[in-house]
Structure formats: structure tokens, C-alpha cells
């Protein structure tokens, strides 16, 4: 059975005081209402240490929004997986649309990061999705196929147990627009099909991997989305940054 995951992406939001206060509230409320769903939190890098310390010893996973695929080295402004491990970080998000769109992150660089992280026993949340222009020009499946085939190139079958995917239609992020359940299901089904075709024997992996939906997910639409066969949770932005709306996702 696939795991249901609710992943909160705080992006470059919240002051330190707000982040730590929210972490305390999450620690108090979420374990009691999680109902078997896995909770992940992705604070900004500056707040990782404080949030991880608060949530230490709970089942809530603290993740990083980005990483550089290297050990300790001279890469100014970057963060090494080795440093993240010291903080108790177990999950790293790779390929978020904002990093692709604004920071030029490519499928091949995502692939390099994913290989490095899996080799070092991290869980990877890999994001894929199309822009509004790509959807309107009929390129949704072409774009996502490239992101999957190039981003997951060379990943060994045994490593997929530490891999989660998220479909985030860029046109539905922070816009208030949400893909209809049918639209989301269509793409999630396609993602499973693409994973099944990566290598011989990948069909079973495709059926077992969790695929989250990200795009203006809120308490009032998540249950409808999760009724779809191939949707296994949410990658949530704004609604994860307040305790009432985050708790409402469970």
C-alpha cells in the first residue's frame, strides 16, 4: 500500500520566531490527528536547525528545500548533505518549479543531486510539472516525460524506496487555481506509466511509489483530490504555513 504524505513547503517565508512557533504547534497537534499520514516540513535553510531540534523524536520529518551534491567543499552559498545530516534532516526536495523557473535548475542537475542524495541515504522528494504555456500548447506530457526520464536517469531499482514524486502544475502554484481532480489524476497516471517504462521490472515500483499533488492545496480541496486513484498526498505551500490550515489537511 502506498504511503499518504502531507508535505509542507514554507519556501522563503516566516521569521525565525514564526517558524519555531509553528514547529511547536505542529509538534503538539499533528501527531494526534495524522491518521497514519506522513507529515513532512520543509523550512527555509536558516530555520532548519531550530525546527529540526523542536521536532526531534517525533514522526514528523524535517526536510531541506535544496542542497548541493557534494561533501564539504568550496561552494560559496551552498549547503552540503553532510551538513544537513548533522541537523537531523532526512528529506530533500529537488526540482521545485521555482528553482527550475527562476534559478535555471535543469533535469540533469536534478539527476546529479538525486543520485548523490540517494547514495547518502536521504529521502528525495522530486518535483515535476508544466507551465501554463506548456499546457496550453499541448506539451504537458512531453515536458513531464523529459523531467522523469532525465531526472531519474540511472537510478537503481533498490533506491526507489527512498523516492517520492510530486506533480506541481506551475500554473496552479500560488494562483488560487487548482487542477481539477480529473486533470490531476490524468497526469499522475501518466507519471506512473513513465516510471514503469524506465527499466525492466519498474512496473511494480511505479505502482508502489507515492506521487503527491502540489498546486494551491487547501483543507477544502484535499479530500476530493485524494479520492483519485493515483494521488497519494499533497505538496502544500501557503496552507502549510499556519497551524489551523496545516492541521486541516489531515
UniProtKB/Swiss-Prot annotation:
The active site is at 96 (electrophile), 168 (proton acceptor). Its main location: cytoplasm. The keyword Isomerase applies. Substrate binds at residues 9-11, 174, 216, 237-238. InterPro entries: Aldolase_TIM, TIM_sf, TrioseP_Isoase_bac/euk, Triosephosphate_isomerase, Triosephosphate_isomerase_AS. It is found in: Cytoplasm. One of its GO terms (cellular component) is cytosol. GO terms for molecular function: triose-phosphate isomerase activity. It is an enzyme of class 5 (isomerase). One of its GO terms (biological process) is glycolytic process. Pathway: Carbohydrate biosynthesis; gluconeogenesis; Carbohydrate degradation; glycolysis; D-glyceraldehyde 3-phosphate from glycerone phosphate: step 1/1. It holds the Pfam family TIM. Its EC number is 5.3.1.1. Keywords: Cytoplasm, Gluconeogenesis, Glycolysis, Isomerase. It catalyses: D-glyceraldehyde 3-phosphate = dihydroxyacetone phosphate. Homodimer. Involved in the gluconeogenesis. Catalyzes stereospecifically the conversion of dihydroxyacetone phosphate (DHAP) to D-glyceraldehyde-3-phosphate (G3P). Belongs to the triosephosphate isomerase family. This is Triosephosphate isomerase. It comes from Leptospira borgpetersenii serovar Hardjo-bovis (strain JB197).
Amino acid at each position: 500500500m502506498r504511503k499518504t504524505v502531507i508535505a509542507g513547503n514554507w519556501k522563503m517565508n516566516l521569521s525565525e520566531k514564526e517558524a519555531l512557533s509553528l514547529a511547536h504547534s505542529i509538534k503538539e497537534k499533528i501527531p494526534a490527528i495524522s491518521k497514519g499520514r506522513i507529515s513532512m516540513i520543509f523550512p527555509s535553510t536558516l530555520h532548519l536547525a531550530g525546527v529540526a531540534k523542536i521536532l526531534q523524536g517525533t514522526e514528523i520529518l524535517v526536510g531541506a528545500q535544496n542542497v548541493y551534491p557534494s561533501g564539504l567543499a568550496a561552494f560559496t552559498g551552498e549547503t552540503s548533505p553532510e551538513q544537513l545530516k548533522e541537523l537531523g534532516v532526512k528529506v530533500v526536495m529537488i526540482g521545485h518549479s521555482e528553482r527550475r523557473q527562476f534559478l535555471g535548475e535543469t533535469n540533469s542537475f536534478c539527476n546529479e543531486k538525486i543520485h548523490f542524495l540517494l547514495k547518502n541515504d536521504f529521502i528525495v522528494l522530486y518535483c515535476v510539472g508544466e507551465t501554463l504555456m506548456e499546457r496550453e500548447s499541448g506539451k504537458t506530457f512531453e515536458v513531464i516525460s523529459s523531467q522523469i526520464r532525465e531526472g531519474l536517469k540511472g537510478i537503481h531499482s533498490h533506491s526507489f524506496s527512498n523516492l517520492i514524486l510530486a506533480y506541481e502544475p506551475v500554473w496552479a502554484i500560488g494562483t488560487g487555481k487548482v487542477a481539477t481532480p480529473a486533470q490531476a489524476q490524468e497526469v499522475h497516471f501518466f507519471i506512473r506509466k513513465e516510471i514503469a517504462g524506465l527499466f525492466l521490472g519498474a512496473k511494480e515500483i511505479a505502482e508502489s511509489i507515492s506521487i503527491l499533488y502540489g498546486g494551491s492545496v487547501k483543507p477544502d480541496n484535499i479530500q476530493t483530490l485524494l479520492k483519485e486513484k493515483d494521488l497519494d498526498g499533497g505538496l502544500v505551500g501557503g496552507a502549510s504555513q499556519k497551524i489551523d490550515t496545516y492541521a486541516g489537511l489531515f
